[in-house]
Amino acid sequence: MRSGIKPRKTPKQQRSQRTREEILEATAHLLNDRPLDEVSTNHIAQKTGISIGTLYKYYPNKDSILADLSLRYMQEDAELFENLFEKYKGRSLKDLIEEAAETLVQIHRKNARVRGVVYQNFERLGLMTEAQSARRRIQTKGTELFSGLDSALMWVTLTAISSTVFAMSQLSPQHRNWEFARNLCRQALGLLMASRA
């Protein structure tokens, strides 16, 4: 992560943790409604219901909030896939593929704009290493639980799925076809599972 965008403090008390979460939630809500350049720390503080001074105790600038939100999404996505893989270990791969495709679509459908902002700013915020690490976590869990999966093909599949859902989420609402995105995800996962040795 680039210097100057790390949070000022890591909250230890429950109230402080809640405030930090509220800041991230307010930021996500604002970014779902308007472009990044139209969201300021003042807007975020106001939406959170705190003073700008309080916000600056947690984050030095808007980029640090965006970076923390990005890391949170990466963590959530990695945990989601790890849990899905664990849930379907030894069970129907078809059911895993269906649930994974549907879950991804629902996540991006709900937070299309904010996830777009997050993904488009990974490199600028110096988060590419963290993004690759999160994807590797998913890849490792998948190859551990499903013997015979090629880790390189797992990487390509995860990248293809993420790109598919992200690209669909960034289209204007009248052009979004989530069933098409689901089908592409199913096909990519199906090809991966069919490639097992």
Q: What are these model-derived regions, one by one?
A:
Residues M1-R18, R196-A197:
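N-terminal intrinsically disordered/low-complexity leader segments
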Residues T10, H29, E38-S40, K62, ...:
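Short glycine/proline-centered loop/turn elements that form peptide/ligand docking sites
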Residues K12, L31, S40-T41, K62, ...:
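Amphipathic alpha-helical segments enriched in hydrophobic/aromatic and basic residues
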Residues S16-T27, I44, L69-L80:
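Generic hydrophobic, amphipathic alpha-helix propensity
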Residues R18, E22, L30-S64:
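Helix-turn-helix
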Residues E38-T41, I52-T54, L153, S162, ...:
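Membrane-embedded alpha-helical bundles of multi-pass transporters/translocases
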Residues Q75-E82, D95-E98, E102-K110, G116-Y119, ...:
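Amphipathic alpha-helical packing segments from all-alpha helical-bundle domains
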Residues I107, V114, E144, L158-W178, ...:
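Amphipathic C-terminal alpha-helical segment
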